[in-house]
Amino acid sequence: MKKHIIYFLMLLPAVFIASGCQKYETGNPPASTVANFTFSTSNSGKAPCVVTFTNTSLNAAGYLWDFGNGQTSTEANPTATYNTPGFYTVKLTCTAVNDVYYNQLVKTAVINVRDPNAGLAQVLYYTTCATAGGAVHMVVLNDDGIAHVQDFAPVTLVKPYGITTDTSNKKVYVSDYSVNAIYRFDADGTNPLKILDITIFPALDAPEGLMVAGDKLYWGQPGGIYRSNLDGTSPELYKSSIDYPADMHYDPVGNKIYAVVDMEDGTGGYFSMNFDGSNLVNHIPGVDGLAIEVNVATGKAYFAGYAVAGTAMPDNGIYTSNIDGTQVQKIGEYGLKATWGVAIDDKRGKLFWSFKNSNYAPDGKIIRANLDGTGKEDWITGINPQAMQAVWIKL
């Protein structure tokens, strides 16, 4: 009997140990919180761009984002806008569901917003009229403020009212209202090629405003916005909701089109719409816009307006407004004849516009001023300027 008691006492601790081990191994620990995210950028990661964040965190009760640009958010999947090149440290802090030591509540990542102008030259391209025919010119902008004009290879032009650039492929496009043609040049003004005329596209009619978006060229003419491939092939009507865009501006970040509409052959007005044609808004009805430039970074739009009594632009002149069309004000004169030229030097905060007193005589000039119209100077004189655009491009 004594022997059995000894055996029982020896086995008793083992029973308790086995029971304790079994309970520990089969239990479930509280779930941890793990912060994590991925992101994608618009505009190929070049400023300005929008970064979209996708939250992949586990078991979180809340979120606090610090985007490194002065902005924060508590949304699960936010977006952030970066207007300036640089490195930005993004920090996501999650609120834990359970207070356990193995939570991972913070995730950081560095976003490199690239400089879109690195290795590029800033160039003002513009067209002119003359009795002997129209022409295209360029000026490389620099800090000395001196206009060193270079001429493009000659082509047949009479009223070159539209100009735009394809910076990705280093090309310049010019439309002629009178000749019914669109030409393409290399960025340095060489290798001219007529890519569209009425023999190629019989519907081509008095093309004016031009813009490039992606792999397409867009232009305005009676009937709406038309487009083709960048080499002029496959021309077609794109959108008829704006009846005659005299000039257009494409915002790649917001994916929007801004346009002014000719009053003589169209309904007039300053419009914006999503790139797919949705959300069409007439911000300034009835105005006769000839040229437009939009500065998305400052929230301002600039126009060459032809006088229409009873509208926000009752006199000929250069106007500015907020992008939504509010606070319209006149900031300059463009002479006795209508002009199709407005451009912005975004590096130096300058505005250019065409000034002319006749249709063909060299009695005009390009005026340069501050963005509010102050500090005007006659920058290039003895010309008859028409359309213009300032861009960063590789020559």
Residue ranges and their predicted role:
Residues 4, 21-120:
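Extracellular/lumenal mature domains of secreted and surface-exposed proteins
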Residues 130-133, 178-180, 263-266, 307-312, ...:
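Short glycine/acidic-enriched loop and turn motifs that connect beta-strands
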Residues 121-123, 168-170, 214-215, 253-255, ...:
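Short coil/turn segments that connect the beta-strands within blades of beta-propeller domains
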Residues 135-138, 181-184, 224-227, 268-272, ...:
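A short loop-to-beta-strand structural motif that recurs across blades of beta-propeller domains
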Residues 125-127, 173-175, 218-220, 258-260, ...:
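Residue position within the beta-strands of beta-propeller blades
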Residues 151-158, 195-203, 238-243, 282-287, ...:
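Surface loop/turn motifs at the tips and blade-to-blade linkers of beta-strand repeat domains
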